[in-house]
C-alpha cells in the first residue's frame, strides 16, 4: 500500500467518525448497518481479490455466525460472551466443512458448490422456522445486549462498535 492509499483509508475512517456527529440518529443506525455489511464485503474481497474464487454462497457464513450467536441466547439461555464463542465455533465448523468440499473445485464448479451450500443453509433456516422464525428472524433480548457493562443497544455504542470492527477489517 502506498502512502497515498494509506492516507485515503484514514480519511475515509475520519469521515465515518465525523458522520456520527453530523447526521441524525436514524442515519447513524443506517451507517452502523452499512459498516457491518462492509465487513462482510471485505471478507468477500479477500476471497475473490486474492484467490480469484467467486463465491456465490458467502452469505452462508455470515448467517452461520449470526445464528450461532442468536440461537444459543434465545433458546439455551447463554450469556453474550459464551454465545459469541459459540458463533465463532459454528462459523469455523461450517466454513471448514464447506471449504473442504468446495476447494476441491474451481471456476464455475466452485460457484455452483458454494451456491448449493448457501441454498441449503437458507432452506434449513426456513424449515427450522420453529427455532429460527424463518425469514422473519428474531430479536435478541435486551439483557443479552449488555457485555461487560456496555449496553450495545445504545445507538452511540452500536455505531462505534461497528466502526471499530469495520476499521480493523478495512485496515487489515
Segments (PLM) and residue ranges:
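Transmembrane alpha-helices and adjacent helix-loop boundaries
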Residues: 1-172
Amino acid at each position: 500500500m502506498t502512502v497515498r492509499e494509506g492516507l485515503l483509508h484514514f480519511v475515509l475512517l475520519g469521515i465515518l467518525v465525523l458522520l456520527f456527529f453530523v447526521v441524525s440518529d436514524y442515519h447513524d443506525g443506517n451507517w452502523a448497518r452499512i459498516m457491518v455489511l462492509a465487513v462482510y464485503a471485505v471478507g468477500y474481497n479477500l476471497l475473490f481479490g486474492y484467490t480469484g474464487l467467486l463465491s456465490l454462497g458467502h452469505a452462508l457464513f455470515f448467517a452461520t455466525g449470526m445464528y450461532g450467536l442468536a440461537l444459543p441466547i434465545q433458546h439455551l439461555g447463554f450469556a453474550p460472551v459464551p454465545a459469541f464463542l459459540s458463533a465463532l465455533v459454528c462459523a469455523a465448523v461450517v466454513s471448514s466443512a464447506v471449504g473442504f468440499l468446495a476447494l476441491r473445485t474451481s471456476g464455475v464448479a466452485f460457484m455452483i458448490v458454494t451456491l448449493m451450500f448457501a441454498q441449503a443453509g437458507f432452506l434449513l433456516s426456513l424449515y427450522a422456522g420453529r427455532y429460527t422464525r424463518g425469514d422473519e428472524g428474531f430479536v435478541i433480548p435486551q439483557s443479552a445486549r449488555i457485555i461487560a457493562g456496555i449496553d450495545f443497544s445504545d445507538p452511540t455504542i452500536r455505531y462505534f462498535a461497528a466502526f471499530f470492527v469495520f476499521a480493523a477489517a478495512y485496515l487489515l
